[in-house]
Amino acid sequence: MALSMEFGFSIGSCFKAPNPPVLISASPNKINFTLRRRKKRFLLRVSAVSYKEFAESALEETRKRIVLEPSHLQEKYSSMTGLDGKTELQMLAFKSSKIRLLRSMAIENETMQVFDFAGFMEPEYDTPIFCANFFTSTNVNIVVLDLNPLHQLTDQTDYQDKYYNKIMSIYHKYAETFPWGGKLTGESIKFFSPLVMWTRFSSSKEKHKALFSAFLEYYQAWLEMTIQVREEMEPSHVRANCEAQHKYLTWRAQKDPGHGLLKRLVGEAKAKELLRDFLFNGVDELGTKTFIDYFPEYQTEDGTVSDKRSIIGKSYETRPWDLTGQFIG
């Protein structure tokens, strides 16, 4: 389950519902009533948020413009119940002539909701990767919304000119409502664009309405890119696109901080399967390079992958792009 590339802190701590405060009273019945009332209030706050509308609206917009058909993954992954018997996981997977995989995962129980929506292109197209990772609990919302660059922008400035410079106004429209959310590691920042909305906030009707609006605007911008992009005919460029997407998927499948939550919900084996075969499908199909091949700095003395979130130790507490989208570090 993908919440973000890497936040520089443990996501796991955010998935625990806060203990409702105990009010001292001479009456045990009154204490129990207060606890139940507070707990109900927390549950209502979570249930008031539904990300189903986000997925439905995105798919509706897509079907207006292109022909979608079910991915082969839809038959294998559609729904799942957590080990607790209460948590529901709902999955959708589609494809088109240009889109290799358009998929969604929604996780919901009494104390949290998670929404992960992503779009990956066929290797013949260099369009960015659509990335929406939203988490809502009783006390916090964590949001990452971006058009992740297929090719790292520090290496290819023409790629930024092609896809980002003309749509920076979308980011500026929501920057004040959704300010920068805190540290991002130096390793993960390479996979984000200057459009990225990385934020944390307390729930409110106004905030979630603004988030829905931002989600649709980002998605419509990405959808327009997929329609306008021309097929790459040069074999070397297709190979470069394929390897770039494989590198991205390999990073996400290995270092996604949502792994811990999935493990608790469905067990270690099923969590790894969901990460590699559904959420980041393509790791085993688009290339043969390993995580260490792409990121040798993570190799330990015994040849395994380090569990550390960051090796270089650099993080960005403030937004590392200027108003024009240029990286300033």
UniProtKB/Swiss-Prot annotation:
<protein>
    <recommendedName>
        <fullName>Phytochromobilin:ferredoxin oxidoreductase, chloroplastic</fullName>
        <ecNumber>1.3.7.4</ecNumber>
    </recommendedName>
</protein>
<keyword id="KW-0809">Transit peptide</keyword>
<dbReference type="GO" id="GO:0010019">
    <property type="term" value="P:chloroplast-nucleus signaling pathway"/>
</dbReference>
<dbReference type="GO" id="GO:0050619">
    <property type="term" value="F:phytochromobilin:ferredoxin oxidoreductase activity"/>
</dbReference>
<comment type="similarity">
    <text>Belongs to the HY2 family.</text>
</comment>
<feature type="transit peptide" description="Chloroplast">
    <location>
        <begin position="1"/>
        <end position="45"/>
    </location>
</feature>
<comment type="function">
    <text>Catalyzes the two-electron reduction of biliverdin IX-alpha to the tetrapyrrole chromophore phytochromobilin (PPhiB).</text>
</comment>
<dbReference type="GO" id="GO:0010024">
    <property type="term" value="P:phytochromobilin biosynthetic process"/>
</dbReference>
<dbReference type="GO" id="GO:0009507">
    <property type="term" value="C:chloroplast"/>
</dbReference>
<dbReference type="GO" id="GO:0050897">
    <property type="term" value="F:cobalt ion binding"/>
</dbReference>
<dbReference type="Pfam" id="PF05996">
    <property type="entry name" value="Fe_bilin_red"/>
</dbReference>
<dbReference type="InterPro" id="IPR009249">
    <property type="entry name" value="Ferredoxin-dep_bilin_Rdtase"/>
</dbReference>
<keyword id="KW-0560">Oxidoreductase</keyword>
<keyword id="KW-0150">Chloroplast</keyword>
<keyword id="KW-0934">Plastid</keyword>
